[in-house]
Amino acid sequence: MFCHLHCMLVVFSLLLTLTGSFVNAQTTEVVTEITATTADPPDPCASNPCTIASTHCVAAGESHTCECRPGYFETNGNCTVAQQFAGSFSVTQVGGSNVLYSADLADTDSAAFASLAADVEDALDTVYQASTMADIYLGSEVWGVPEWLYRGRLHVLFATEDAGQPVLVNSTDATEAFTTALAAEAANLGITIDDSTITVSDFDECASADDNDCDPNANCTNTAGSFTCECDTELYDNSPNTEEPGRVCIAPCDPGLCTRPNEICNNGGTIEDDNLCKCIEGYDYTQYGDCDPMARSTDFRCYHCEDSIDNVKCNGRMESENGTARQCPNPTDTCYQTIQMNPEGDGFMIRKGCMNLEDCYDLLYSYEADPAKASCFEYIFPYGQDTPPGPGVQCHYCCSEYFPLDLCNYDSIHFIYGTPRINSWDPRMNWDLSMNLDATEEPESGSQRHLPVCGVLSLVVTTLLALMLH
């Protein structure tokens, strides 16, 4: 459960510089300057090595330990959420005589306090472990005996499955067991305990930041047996576990940024990997920049091309699909029937994003590339062959960062024996050799022409066919 990591040694360098060494008739002087620099030691917790949600990393020199988060307690090697009670009692007599307070009891490091605490904790363990609460009892701890009153303060823990569980132990049951334990211990020690001073009440985890794991910018609310956290109203809740909100609160974006529905700041509004905004969990960007619900494995929809006001475009996208819609080679054309818009089986689905050309080529033959997500799909090779002469097509979304989004998918044409180029994200496959290439928009003078993938492949296939005929 608890792990240790030996990290890099502290770098300590000595620079020995002979700044002056000369001899003359009167004196001989050797000046030696030593400059020592010590590099900052690496943070062993920087990589977030504690992956279990109930733990957090605690640096220990060049190593680290994974300890239970505040509000969790270690039991049998696991960190468990505990229902906590605060108990107290007063001792009035010892050996039949009234109590004279011992200053040693105020010192939690003293032998007197350690002895009394151990006796009381053992008695509580014996009673609770013999009760109906044995399965969930975690332990007790004597916190102190304040000088102003011979009154012990205790902490009693009961396990729950998670912080949202209802109260499993009420204070009445806990008090009865507590009273029984103290009575037995009082008889063994020859002390008298004032029953009217025995209390067991819900522990307030919000009283100290050490007892809860709420974000510093969240409001902690004590509940029966637990606590809840809620981010301040002006902050966004970015907690990794949706069932435990208020653990990570981030600042909102500057006004005017990340304003689309279901869109939030990424990393608290700081730019990292050129992605300032992101969709909330369960949503993803569409080709129009909207955050729509992500696809389910059964969601798919083919494309149908039809005339539009500005030009012939492909539409009919499913809500969870994203990318750049390509132009259609013909005024109307139905999509290739065996291609589906789903992440499994035939067809593929992509994520929004562009990468530069060098990165694109490095990832051409990878089944998964970030930010592209794709899978191979089945297709019919031209001329009626059952299989293509090359390997299966791996469709990745690659494009040049220098081209606008609407031309993004037409950069870096790549094909294998007439099969679709790697960065063609459109699931539609059309091998019609009579496509109307004039349906695409003409580029501005001096710019590179980017043809639709089917048009490019038609030229390739036509050229190959012409060569074969000759």
From Swiss-Prot:
GO terms for cellular component: motile cilium; plasma membrane; side of membrane. It comes from the Eukaryota. Residues 41-80, 202-250, 249-292 form the EGF-like domain. Residues 447-470 form a propeptide. The lineage of its organism: Eukaryota, Metazoa, Echinodermata, Eleutherozoa, Echinozoa. It holds the Pfam family SEA. A lipid is attached at G446 (GPI-anchor amidated glycine). The keyword Disulfide bond applies. Disulfide bonds join C45-C57, C50-C66, C68-C79, C206-C220, C214-C229, C231-C249, C253-C265, C258-C277, C279-C291. Keywords: Cell membrane, Cell projection, Cilium, Disulfide bond, EGF-like domain, Flagellum, Glycoprotein, GPI-anchor, Lipoprotein, Membrane, Repeat, Signal. It comes from Strongylocentrotus purpuratus (Purple sea urchin). Residues 1-25 form the signal peptide. Glycans are attached at N78, N170, N219, N322. It is found in: Cell projection, Cilium, Flagellum membrane. This is 63 kDa sperm flagellar membrane protein. One of its GO terms (molecular function) is calcium ion binding. Residues 81-205 form the SEA domain. The keyword Ribonucleoprotein does not apply. Sperm. It is a lipid-anchor; GPI-anchor.
